[in-house]
Amino acid sequence: QFPSARSASWTLDDVESPRNSGWFLCALAARRAITFLEEQPEVDPDRLGVYGHSMGGKLTVMTAVDSRIKAAAPSCGGISDRYNDSELFRATLGDDVSLKQISCPIMFLSPANDFHGRIGDLPVAVNEIRSTDWRVTCSPHHNHQDTPAYEVATLLWFDQHLKQTFTMPQTPKTSLQLS
């Protein structure tokens, strides 16, 4: 019951409600996991990041709204769930709802031909986030996966924003002059 807020005999609410979606429960669990982690003596609560692939990419976006998250990297998800049939679902659990609240540094991993986190939705997602510290990696012909050559960007992103042991190169300036 992930892409639905409809009621069923086993859902929390007997009317259409975001709480009936598996996304609500997963996001709640992720927020509780953050609370658990920040209470552990071996964890620095000021250096928490979140990464997820596919459905985990959507969950990464839903979790990155939490101010305790200092860096995020959604892979193949979290940008395209905005066309659900339910107006209530779109207004509460659509990717744009979470993206508009993200202020932490975020690295989008988006293969060029992914069927789940569609690259055509990436410019809209980037424009929706509040963070000005963002990057995108796009791998050609990798469908719904990220391979080590592209995944390394995630590790470096977290090294920069959580460990302060790396600095990503600046985005080069580009221009186009038509004569």
Residue ranges, per PLM feature:
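Cap/lid segment of the alpha/beta-hydrolase catalytic domain
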Residues: 1-28, 83-88
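Primarily recognizes the serine-hydrolase "nucleophile elbow" in alpha/beta-hydrolase
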Residues: 32-90
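Alpha-helical scaffolding within the catalytic cores
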Residues: 58, 86-97, 120-124
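Short beta-strand/loop motif that positions the catalytic acidic residue
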Residues: 102, 108-110
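Short alpha-helix in the alpha/beta-hydrolase fold that links the catalytic acid
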Residues: 104, 118-127
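Acidic catalytic loop of the alpha/beta-hydrolase fold
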Residues: 112-117, 144-145
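Catalytic histidine neighborhood in serine/cysteine hydrolases
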Residues: 129-145
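Surface beta-strand/loop "capping" patches
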Residues: 149-150, 156-179
